[in-house]
Amino acid sequence: MTKSAKIGVLLANLGTPDSPTPKSISRYLWQFLTDPRVVDLPRCKWYPLLKAIILPLRSKRIAKNYQAIWTEQGSPLLAISRQQKDALQAYLDTQNINAQVEIAMTYGNPSIQSTVKNLLKNQVERIIVLPLYPQYSSSTTGAVFDAFANALKEERGLVPFDFIHSYHIDENYINALANSIKVRLKSDEFLLFSYHGIPLRYEKMGDYYREHCKQTTIAVVNKLGLTENQWGMTFQSRFGREEWLQPYTDKFLESAATQNIQKIAVICPGFSVDCLETIEEIDKENRENFLTNGGQSYQYIPALNVEHTHIEMMGKLILEKLA
């Protein structure tokens, strides 16, 4: 491959409904919840339950939450992802890299399949896939890999590709997180690292997501010079009745005041883009949860989104693959 060869860069994230309506959300959730990487229950049991009970009820409830955060540009996740794409494209241009940067979603639009087709149509000679999940999990990064592999199955010619597995202790990522926290965290605030949870059963089956979360947290804590009583780590967004990774974020915040934690700042290092889970669940629902249970002040520290340190980190991950 020559130095001027065109590179396709695929920024992958979870996805979003096309609109904040129950019908659109139901269609999106069907894609999401029928992926065996996400829910591995037998189809004969899971699908009827999903169709008859879960989708009708959950779609209506979630629609209200999406409507509360929807923008003229669509969902925050999609709008910010587009900004990330443009910013990364500009960064790679300054590095004289002949690249076409695209965003793609595991569920919803733009799909990974359609994005890969578009890149190949534009004759890229190599694709670099960057799942925007710093910490590997089979239910997120693994699902991106499946979707990307399925997209390539339709092609007779297999384009060379690189798949960035994780970047949970990448120096530029840790520095970006630490800098974002440093300019916002007050000296009397307890810092809570909240990560999206996964079923405990998945960990027992070999998913090492929790360990990646721990390594990220410890690296940031060391960078900031925090003591043991100044921070904690929890897991959010559990779904269903089975046990997930603990401690649970909502339960921790309910009882934090009884542990003499009156002022708190929450950051979600696993989210590269602010979305429903951070804006609605963490910044709104859990704020109310903490304050109504004796807390005095609550701060949500936003995702890295389009901060220049975040875009530069992405760019350097790409450049490392091209070295």
Swiss-Prot record:
Keyword field: Cytoplasm, Heme biosynthesis, Iron, Lyase, Metal-binding, Porphyrin biosynthesis
Reaction equations catalysed: heme b + 2 H(+) = protoporphyrin IX + Fe(2+)
Keyword NADP tagged: no
GO MF annotations in UniProt: ferrochelatase activity; metal ion binding
A GO CC term assigned to this protein in UniProt: cytoplasm
Pathway note: Porphyrin-containing compound metabolism; protoheme biosynthesis; protoheme from protoporphyrin-IX: step 1/1
Main location class: cytoplasm
Pfam families: Ferrochelatase
One of the GO biological process terms: heme biosynthetic process
Protein's cellular compartments: Cytoplasm
InterPro entries: Ferrochelatase, Ferrochelatase_AS, Ferrochelatase_C, Ferrochelatase_N
Record: residues binding Fe cation: 196, 277
EC assignment: 4.98.1.1
Keyword Metal-binding: yes
Protein name as annotated: Ferrochelatase
Organism this protein belongs to: Haemophilus influenzae (strain 86-028NP)
High-level lineage: Bacteria, Pseudomonadati, Pseudomonadota, Gammaproteobacteria, Pasteurellales
